[in-house]
Amino acid sequence: MEIIHTPFGIDDPYFIVQGYEREPREPLEGDRVKVSFVTDPMVVGQRAWIEVQSDGKRYKRRAQYQLNHGGKAHWEVNIDGESAGVTVRYRFIAGRGPSTYVTSEWYEYTVCKWIEAKRFLSLKNNRLTVNRSDATSCDCLKEAYLLTDGKELYDLKIILEREEGERFYGLGEHFDAITIPEGEERYIHVYDQYKVQRSRGYAPVPFILSDRGRAILIDTGFLSSFKIDGSKITLSVYTKGCSIEGTEIQFWKEDSPLKAIEKIHKIARPCPPPLWALGPWLSANQWNSQKKVMEVLRETVQRDLPATTLVIEAWSDEQTFYIFNGAEYDPVSGDDKFSLKDFRFREPWPDPVEMINKLHERGIRLVLWQIPVIKSFDESTPQPAIDIRYGSSRGYFVRTRDGSDYRIPAARWHEGNVVVDFYNEEAAKWWASKREYLVEELGVDGFKTDGGEHLWGRDTLTAAGSAAKVRNTYPERYFETVSGILREEGILFSRAGYTRSPAHTLFWVGDEDSTWEALRDNITAGLNVSISGNPFWGWDIAGFSGEVPTMELYRRSIELAVFTPIFQLHSEDSGDPSPSSERTPWNLAKAWKDESIIDYYRNFASLRMTLSPYIYRESLHAAQASLPLTLPLFLIEKDNDPEGLAYLFGRDMVVSPAVDEEMKEESFFLKVNG
C-alpha cells in the first residue's frame, strides 16, 4: 500500500488538488490545518492516523475516511494551531492492523506570522527593495507587512492609498475587462488556462496604471497580485518559501496615463516586426503533411488570396520537435547535432526543401511550431531517447529537489515529459544547436514558440533557483534562446509571456472559441497587453476552437483583424477532421455553401496588404516612442468608455470594434490628423 500526500499540490493559485494537499499550504499563527491524503489501494477495514510532533508535543489522531475514488481511499485529519516560529512535523500511518501498517515519510512546516515591514524596505529613486541591511524610511506607504517564520523573510504585502474615483488598468493579458474590477485579488501567474480565461492569462504583467498617471511595476518572477478595493491598493508577492530579499517594486507618476505608459514600454523593449510579418497569415493544426501545405498554396494562388506567412504546427516527430515527421536518419550522440544532409526525408514530408522554396517563390515565409519539452514514446525513432539521456546526464533539464529530472505533472499540458532548463546556458546552447539547420540550411523564417507555462511547484528547480521564483520569467529565457538562431528578419510568435518577453517575440492572445463572446474577450486581452508594454499582438481570427464560425462572425472578425497588429487565421483540430475545421475562406465557403466569403476575405486581405507599409511605419514609431500600436482611446480622451474598446491604430486611424452580434454596422475607421 502507498500513502500519497502533496502538501503544496503544484502551487496552483487557482486550484487546490482535493484529497492530497494541506490547507492552508503555509499555515499562520493559530491556524488549524486540514491535511488530506490518499491510501492506494483502498482495502476493506483500513484505518489511518496522523502522528504529529511540535514544540515538544507529540500526539496521534485518527484520520476520517472521506471516499473511495478509483480504488483509492481519501482521508482528512486536522493539526492543531501553533505559535509563530514553531516547526510542525507529521506523518501518516495506515493499514488494517499492526501487521499491515504502512508509515509515510515525515512532512513539516514552520508556522509564520505577518510583521510590520517598513524597517526592512529601502526606497531609492522610486524603487522599493526588500533589503535588511540598507533599509530607509518608507513613510509613503500606508501599510507594509512581511511574512516571517522568525528567521527568514518571505511574502510581502503593501497597502497604498487610492485617490477617490481613481481607476486602474494593465496587468498584461486578461480577458474580462479593461478597467481592473474592484474587490478581486488579481494574480500575476503565467498560466495555461484553456479557453474562457477571464482573469487568468498566459502572458500577465505585474503592472498597473491609473487614470491619474500613477504606475506600479512589481519587478519579480514570484507570484504576485494586485487588489483595488475602496480607498486601498494592495500589492502582494508570494515567494512560496523562498527569501524575498532583493525583490523590487517600481513606482512612477506622470502628468498623464499616456506618459506613464512610456516607461513600461521602455522596460519591455518591444521589437517591431518585419514588413513580411504584417501581411495575412495562414495556419491550421490539421496541416500535417507536405501534400496539405501544397494544397493550401495552390488554393491561395488560384484564388488570388494575399498571404505572407504560413505556420505549420504538426510538422515534427512530436518528440524532439526538431526532426521532420517520417524522416529517416542515423542517430547521433546526444552532444551532436544534425545537418540537412543527415536526413532521408519520407512521407508525410518527402521534400521540405522543395516545399519551402515554393513558399518563398510566392513571397510566403514559413514559421514552424516549437515547445520547450522533449518526449520519447516511439522506439522506432531513437534520437529522442538519446537526447533525453544525454541532457539528463548533463543537468540540462529542470529538476526536482531530489536531483531527478522534473516531469510535467499529471493533467497538465504535455504531462510526464522533461522540460529544458534555459537558465542553464549550456543547456540553452545545446537545445538551440539542434535547430540551427532548420534556419541555416532549410531557410525557416521563424518559430511559433508555444508553451512556456510548464514549471509547477516550489520543489521544481532550475539553474536560477526554484520555480516559485522563475516560473513567470521562464518564457523570457525560452524566447531569448530561440531568437538567437534566427536570421535578421526572423520572428517568434508566442502565447506565453511576461514583462520583458516583447523584446524577443510577437504575441497572440488566446486560445478561444469561435463565438461572439470570445471575439470581445480577445480584443479586450489585446488592448490590455498593449497597455502593459506588449504592442505587437494578434489573435486567431474568429476563434480557433469548435465548429467553424458563423459567416457574420467570420466577416466581422476579418474586418477587425485588418486593423490589429497581426492578421492570423488558425484552427485547433489535428489530423484529418471531417468536416474540416480550418478557418481558411475556401473552407468556410464549403461549410456554409457560400462562395461570396472568398471574395469578401480577398478584399480585406488585400486591404491589409495595402496597409502593411503604414502598419510597419507605425510599428517602428510605436517601438521608438514607447507607445502601444493599438492605443486605447480612453487614455487620451477622458470621456471615452474603456469597455467600448475603441483605439488608435497607429497615429492616423481610429478603430471602433463591432464585437457584439447585435451591432449590425461594420466596424468603423476614421482618418484623423497625425
PLM features per residue range, with description:
Residues 273-464, 502:
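Aromatic-lined carbohydrate-binding/catalytic grooves of carbohydrate-active enzymes
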Residues 304, 484-485, 498, 567-674:
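Carbohydrate-binding surfaces of carbohydrate-active enzymes
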Residues 376-387, 455-464, 491-521, 531, ...:
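Substrate-binding cleft/loops of secretory-pathway carbohydrate-active enzymes
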